[in-house]
Amino acid sequence: MKKKLVLIIIDGLGLRLESQGNGFALAKTPVFDRLFQEYPNSLIAASGQEVGLPEGQMGNSEVGHLNIGAGFVVYTGISIINNALKTGKFFENEKFILAFRHSIKTGFPLQIMGLFSPGGVHSHQDHLFALIDFAANFGVKKLNLHLFGDGRDVGPKSIKPWIKMLNLKLKNYEDYKIASISGRFYSMDRDKMFDRVELGYNALLGKAENTFTDPIDYINFQYEKGVSDEFFEPAINLKVNKKDFLADDHPVIFFNFRPDRARQLSHLILQTDLYEQKPKNPIKTDVFVSMMKYEGINCLVAFEEMRVENPLGKLISMAGFRQLRLAETQKYAHVTFFVDGGVELELENSDRILIDSLKVQSYADFPQMSAVEITDKLLEVGQNYDFIIMNFANPDMVGHTGDLKATIKAVEILDFQIGRICKWAEEKNFDFFITADHGNAELTEDENGNPSTKHTTFPVMLISSDKTIKLKSGKLANIAPTILDYLGLDKHPDMDHDSLIIKDK
């Protein structure tokens, strides 16, 4: 008899012993308590080199889901680019050189934009510094930087020291300037909130209500208003000539390597077919370079990604299982695009259900997000499928607010939903595995008691509903082989990691 299985991916829920600032440990979680006490479980590494990131680098949702589906460690953006820097290949990149030559030939400024922080989730400031050096050494005379405040993968108000470092570098070059500043809330939305994105886009064009002559002064002004890095209101530098802001035929480099929050802004610049929304102030450029491939965006790509040819979902489909992917908007791409290897796969006998995420400024005010609706939908249609991958976004998205009380509430709401799924699974003869893609909710305060809004390097859980098996510890790349093993299916030779189910000798 074919087994039926649900893989529940809890976004941003790591395991940490200390209780201070721990939204998981401080929450009332009778369901999780029972699962840990009575069911097979183990620890899963979800950060650093274990998931293809630099040593000590916190995990993230994209990398986590890629590794979960791949069955091997997937080296992604930051590792690929860092290696190019290490070997010197970065400074031979033909796509960058093409953009530089276009700037030199036309006399138009090189426009470089991206998330400015050492967070390493969507971008890294070291890559920007390297680009500036590369452009200068190649002979680019005029360069404009369009910086997006982070405040999420790093501290909420942490950008000033890095801006000061950047200013020191820019002093070496007469026409290299910070042309605009905006928060990632505007420039890196992924939830089709184009009213926000257009404000960030307009700042690239030199159109914004807010202005500055000194970036540090503007940051201080925003802080005085209670605005953190993530939410910086788009502003432009009055010292930059109006004609030097982004315009027709200007070369552009977008130094974000992670695609999901880069696609909407890229779409507005390039006017692709990816979304219906069109910019009110369109421009045209044929020289647009992305660090890595942004799915659906036709542009020059600086670095090729590692390919996942035979992900878990593809093998499940080939085995004749009817499968479902279920998540809310914030994590829908992760249970489809990313877990399928970073491509849009059309799998036989496979359905996708998207539950709309609440359109709010802060999930701290709505820690339930769409967890109840996701569970309701599973209970409504789940019995029609053999294999289900689903995601709960609460711990991650609420954890990003740094609000401990809200994070505790999010975890408690999630615990209740997991309880509903446990009951349903037993009634419908389903088994389940519960894991997470990375940590977050378990650390909402730093060592000084200030809010921590970033991911963590703590391990995550793997829990099985089947009391007849035993699990050993591993990493996210072990999960696909474990599921295939449990379902009695062979893993693909590409999957060089083993099942975590302990076999009797």
Swiss-Prot record:
Residues annotated as binding Mn(2+) 2: D11, S61, D437, H438
Cofactor(s) essential for the protein: Mn(2+)
Annotated pathway: Carbohydrate degradation; glycolysis; pyruvate from D-glyceraldehyde 3-phosphate: step 3/5
EC number: 5.4.2.12
Keywords, alphabetical: Glycolysis, Isomerase, Manganese, Metal-binding
EC category name: isomerase
Gene Ontology annotations of biological process type: glucose catabolic process; glycolytic process
Binding locations of Mn(2+) 1: D396, H400, H455
InterPro entries tied to this protein: Alkaline_phosphatase_core_sf, BPG-indep_PGM_N, Metalloenzyme, PGAM_B_sf, Pgm_bpd_ind
Family, as annotated: Belongs to the BPG-independent phosphoglycerate mutase family.
Job of this protein: Catalyzes the interconversion of 2-phosphoglycerate and 3-phosphoglycerate.
Protein name: 2,3-bisphosphoglycerate-independent phosphoglycerate mutase
Lineage summary: Bacteria, Bacillati, Mycoplasmatota, Mycoplasmoidales, Metamycoplasmataceae
Gene: gpmI
